[in-house]
Amino acid sequence: TLSNPQIVICVPTGATNVERRAIRESADAAGARRVFLIDEPVAAAIGAGLPVAEATGSMIVDIGGGTTEVAVLSLGGVVHATSVKAAGDKFDEAIIEYMRASHKLAIGETTAERMKKEIGSASSPEDGDGKSMNVKGRDLITGLPKEISISQRQIAEALAEPVAHIIDTIKRALEQIPPELSADIV
Protein backbone atom coordinates (compact mmCIF):
# COMPACT_ATOMS: atom_id res chain seq x y z
CA THR A 1 0.00 0.00 0.00
CA LEU A 2 1.00 3.60 -0.34
CA SER A 3 0.92 4.17 3.40
CA ASN A 4 3.47 1.41 4.08
CA PRO A 5 5.29 0.76 0.81
CA GLN A 6 8.06 -1.69 0.04
CA ILE A 7 10.88 0.32 -1.51
CA VAL A 8 13.75 -0.69 -3.78
CA ILE A 9 16.57 1.86 -3.85
CA CYS A 10 19.51 1.82 -6.26
CA VAL A 11 22.86 2.65 -4.70
CA PRO A 12 26.27 3.22 -6.30
CA THR A 13 28.56 0.19 -6.05
CA GLY A 14 31.09 2.30 -4.17
CA ALA A 15 28.63 3.19 -1.40
CA THR A 16 30.04 2.37 2.04
CA ASN A 17 28.15 0.42 4.70
CA VAL A 18 27.60 3.70 6.57
CA GLU A 19 26.10 5.32 3.44
CA ARG A 20 23.91 2.26 2.79
CA ARG A 21 22.68 2.31 6.39
CA ALA A 22 21.88 6.04 6.10
CA ILE A 23 19.89 5.40 2.92
CA ARG A 24 18.00 2.54 4.58
CA GLU A 25 17.28 4.63 7.70
CA SER A 26 16.02 7.53 5.56
CA ALA A 27 13.61 5.20 3.77
CA ASP A 28 12.48 3.74 7.10
CA ALA A 29 11.90 7.26 8.47
CA ALA A 30 9.84 8.05 5.36
CA GLY A 31 7.50 5.19 6.27
CA ALA A 32 8.76 2.26 4.25
CA ARG A 33 7.58 -1.14 5.43
CA ARG A 34 10.55 -2.91 3.83
CA VAL A 35 13.63 -1.49 2.13
CA PHE A 36 15.73 -3.29 -0.47
CA LEU A 37 19.03 -1.87 -1.69
CA ILE A 38 20.32 -2.91 -5.11
CA ASP A 39 23.57 -1.90 -6.76
CA GLU A 40 22.93 0.55 -9.62
CA PRO A 41 24.73 -1.59 -12.24
CA VAL A 42 22.62 -4.63 -11.32
CA ALA A 43 19.43 -2.59 -11.70
CA ALA A 44 20.66 -1.21 -15.04
CA ALA A 45 21.52 -4.69 -16.29
CA ILE A 46 18.11 -6.03 -15.28
CA GLY A 47 16.47 -3.09 -17.04
CA ALA A 48 18.53 -3.79 -20.17
CA GLY A 49 17.46 -7.43 -20.14
CA LEU A 50 20.96 -8.81 -19.54
CA PRO A 51 21.29 -12.31 -18.02
CA VAL A 52 22.49 -11.09 -14.61
CA ALA A 53 21.67 -14.28 -12.70
CA GLU A 54 23.47 -16.60 -15.12
CA ALA A 55 27.09 -17.79 -14.96
CA THR A 56 28.03 -15.52 -17.82
CA GLY A 57 29.70 -12.13 -17.80
CA SER A 58 27.83 -8.94 -18.67
CA MET A 59 29.13 -5.38 -18.72
CA ILE A 60 27.23 -2.20 -17.98
CA VAL A 61 28.65 1.20 -18.91
CA ASP A 62 26.48 3.88 -17.30
CA ILE A 63 27.41 7.32 -18.60
CA GLY A 64 25.78 9.78 -16.23
CA GLY A 65 26.00 13.52 -15.83
CA GLY A 66 29.15 13.63 -13.72
CA THR A 67 30.58 10.11 -13.70
CA THR A 68 30.67 7.01 -15.86
CA GLU A 69 30.36 3.72 -14.01
CA VAL A 70 31.73 0.55 -15.60
CA ALA A 71 30.63 -2.71 -13.99
CA VAL A 72 31.00 -6.40 -14.81
CA LEU A 73 28.26 -8.66 -13.48
CA SER A 74 27.84 -12.42 -13.15
CA LEU A 75 25.70 -14.75 -11.02
CA GLY A 76 23.52 -11.87 -9.81
CA GLY A 77 26.31 -9.74 -8.42
CA VAL A 78 28.97 -7.20 -9.27
CA VAL A 79 32.32 -8.85 -10.04
CA HIS A 80 34.18 -5.60 -10.73
CA ALA A 81 33.14 -1.95 -10.73
CA THR A 82 34.94 1.30 -11.27
CA SER A 83 33.97 4.85 -12.06
CA VAL A 84 35.61 7.74 -13.84
CA LYS A 85 34.80 11.45 -13.90
CA ALA A 86 34.27 11.53 -17.66
CA ALA A 87 30.60 11.82 -18.50
CA GLY A 88 27.93 14.16 -19.80
CA ASP A 89 29.30 17.31 -18.19
CA LYS A 90 32.79 16.62 -19.58
CA PHE A 91 31.24 16.08 -23.01
CA ASP A 92 29.56 19.49 -22.77
CA GLU A 93 32.83 21.13 -21.66
CA ALA A 94 34.70 19.48 -24.55
CA ILE A 95 32.16 20.80 -27.07
CA ILE A 96 32.34 24.32 -25.61
CA GLU A 97 36.16 24.27 -25.77
CA TYR A 98 36.14 22.85 -29.31
CA MET A 99 33.81 25.61 -30.51
CA ARG A 100 36.01 28.23 -28.85
CA ALA A 101 39.31 26.86 -30.18
CA SER A 102 38.27 25.68 -33.65
CA HIS A 103 35.56 28.18 -34.58
CA LYS A 104 36.23 31.17 -32.31
CA LEU A 105 32.62 30.89 -31.18
CA ALA A 106 31.45 31.16 -27.57
CA ILE A 107 28.47 28.95 -26.75
CA GLY A 108 26.76 28.13 -23.48
CA GLU A 109 26.15 24.83 -21.71
CA THR A 110 22.58 24.61 -23.01
CA THR A 111 23.76 24.88 -26.62
CA ALA A 112 26.55 22.35 -26.03
CA GLU A 113 24.09 19.89 -24.53
CA ARG A 114 21.68 20.35 -27.44
CA MET A 115 24.54 19.69 -29.87
CA LYS A 116 25.54 16.57 -27.93
CA LYS A 117 21.98 15.23 -28.00
CA GLU A 118 21.22 16.08 -31.63
CA ILE A 119 24.47 15.22 -33.42
CA GLY A 120 26.80 13.86 -30.74
CA SER A 121 28.74 10.75 -31.63
CA ALA A 122 31.55 8.73 -30.07
CA SER A 123 32.97 8.01 -33.51
CA SER A 124 33.09 9.79 -36.84
CA PRO A 125 30.60 8.78 -39.55
CA GLU A 126 31.87 6.10 -41.96
CA ASP A 127 31.64 8.43 -44.94
CA GLY A 128 31.08 12.14 -45.14
CA ASP A 129 30.36 14.44 -42.23
CA GLY A 130 27.10 12.86 -41.03
CA LYS A 131 24.24 14.98 -39.76
CA SER A 132 24.70 18.67 -39.10
CA MET A 133 22.98 21.49 -37.27
CA ASN A 134 23.15 25.26 -37.11
CA VAL A 135 24.60 26.70 -33.91
CA LYS A 136 24.33 30.26 -32.66
CA GLY A 137 26.89 31.87 -30.42
CA ARG A 138 29.08 34.93 -29.96
CA ASP A 139 31.97 35.46 -32.34
CA LEU A 140 35.08 35.79 -30.16
CA ILE A 141 36.78 38.08 -32.70
CA THR A 142 34.00 40.59 -33.38
CA GLY A 143 31.88 40.09 -30.26
CA LEU A 144 28.80 39.87 -32.47
CA PRO A 145 26.22 37.08 -32.70
CA LYS A 146 27.12 34.45 -35.28
CA GLU A 147 25.55 31.27 -36.65
CA ILE A 148 27.54 28.39 -38.14
CA SER A 149 26.87 24.82 -39.26
CA ILE A 150 28.52 22.02 -37.26
CA SER A 151 28.70 18.38 -38.38
CA GLN A 152 28.53 15.09 -36.55
CA ARG A 153 32.15 14.47 -37.57
CA GLN A 154 33.21 17.71 -35.83
CA ILE A 155 31.38 16.77 -32.63
CA ALA A 156 33.03 13.32 -32.67
CA GLU A 157 36.37 15.15 -32.89
CA ALA A 158 35.38 17.39 -29.96
CA LEU A 159 34.39 14.37 -27.84
CA ALA A 160 37.46 12.28 -28.67
CA GLU A 161 39.30 12.90 -25.39
CA PRO A 162 36.50 12.14 -22.88
CA VAL A 163 35.36 9.16 -24.98
CA ALA A 164 38.94 7.82 -25.02
CA HIS A 165 39.03 8.13 -21.22
CA ILE A 166 35.86 6.01 -20.95
CA ILE A 167 37.23 3.44 -23.41
CA ASP A 168 40.45 3.18 -21.36
CA THR A 169 38.35 2.57 -18.24
CA ILE A 170 36.45 -0.20 -20.03
CA LYS A 171 39.72 -1.82 -21.15
CA ARG A 172 41.12 -1.66 -17.60
CA ALA A 173 37.95 -3.28 -16.27
CA LEU A 174 38.29 -6.13 -18.78
CA GLU A 175 41.90 -6.64 -17.63
CA GLN A 176 40.81 -6.89 -13.97
CA ILE A 177 38.28 -9.71 -14.36
CA PRO A 178 38.73 -13.46 -14.95
CA PRO A 179 39.48 -14.29 -18.61
CA GLU A 180 36.29 -16.38 -18.89
CA LEU A 181 34.14 -13.34 -18.10
CA SER A 182 36.13 -11.16 -20.50
CA ALA A 183 35.48 -13.73 -23.24
CA ASP A 184 31.72 -13.58 -22.51
CA ILE A 185 31.73 -9.80 -22.86
CA VAL A 186 34.00 -9.38 -25.87
PLM region spans:
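Conserved Rossmann-like nucleotide-cofactor binding loop
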Residues: 66
